[in-house]
């Protein structure tokens, strides 16, 4: 949900003012923690082995780490030092890495995107207009503005800079509530090959029975 925005803002405060290697390490640690907690189901899916769980978490964490270094480098650009500039650069770089890991290597691993938990929030209404890319970008954009609104280490030229950042972040969250959701029925049809619902627990016992899951 929307708690992701302040969480990402806090994370951003750790990487946008440090060197590339430190940002890499910070995001690698963050990424490993995130993915190990997100995909423990891979242990059961691979027969109870921890190695695939750890390996997949590490590979995905590398993408986070690369983004950390990229963010650190982009913050050295003069036009990225403003609140709007940083928000734009950070949103584009994060979504770019997010889409990269969703398609690479092989067919990618499109889990853990910032857009997914926003389905029941006002930002979820942006999905029909730009898909997960737009939703993730707006989440990051809001997070940067929130981070800048509480960044007292910078000497802003105007007293209203921080309040304006905060108000803008709030507005970006609230405004999508005014967007209509199309309730009309779509034309055409789609064929679904298979639908897999929940399985009986314990999972390994269910998997061991041939045809019970896929039959």
Label each residue range with its predicted role.
Residues 1-183:
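Membrane-embedded alpha-helical bundles of multi-pass enzymes
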Residues 179-215:
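Soluble catalytic regions of membrane-associated enzymes that act on cell-envelope
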């Amino acid at each position: 949900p929307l708690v992701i925005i302040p969480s990402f803002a806090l994370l951003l405060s750790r990487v946008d003012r440090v060197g590339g290697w430190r940002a890499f390490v910070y995001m690698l640690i963050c990424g490993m923690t995130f993915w190990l907690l997100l995909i423990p189901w891979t242990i059961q899916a691979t027969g109870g082995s921890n190695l695939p769980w750890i390996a997949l978490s590490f590979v995905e964490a590398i993408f986070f780490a690369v983004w950390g270094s990229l963010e650190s480098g982009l913050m050295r650009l003069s036009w990225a030092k403003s609140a709007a500039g940083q928000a734009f650069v950070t949103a584009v770089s994060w979504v770019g890495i997010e889409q990269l890991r969703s398609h690479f290597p092989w067919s990618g691993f499109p889990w853990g995107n910032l857009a997914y938990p926003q389905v029941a929030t006002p930002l979820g209404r942006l999905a029909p207009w730009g898909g997960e890319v737009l939703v993730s970008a707006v989440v990051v954009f809001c997070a940067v503005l929130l981070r800048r609104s509480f960044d007292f280490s910078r000497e802003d030229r105007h007293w209203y800079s921080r309040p304006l950042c905060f108000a803008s972040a709030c507005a970006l969250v609230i405004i999508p509530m005014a967007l209509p959701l199309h309730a009309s029925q779509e034309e055409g049809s789609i064929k679904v090959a298979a639908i897999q619902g929940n399985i009986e627990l314990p999972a390994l016992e269910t998997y061991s029975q041939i045809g019970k899951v896929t039959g």
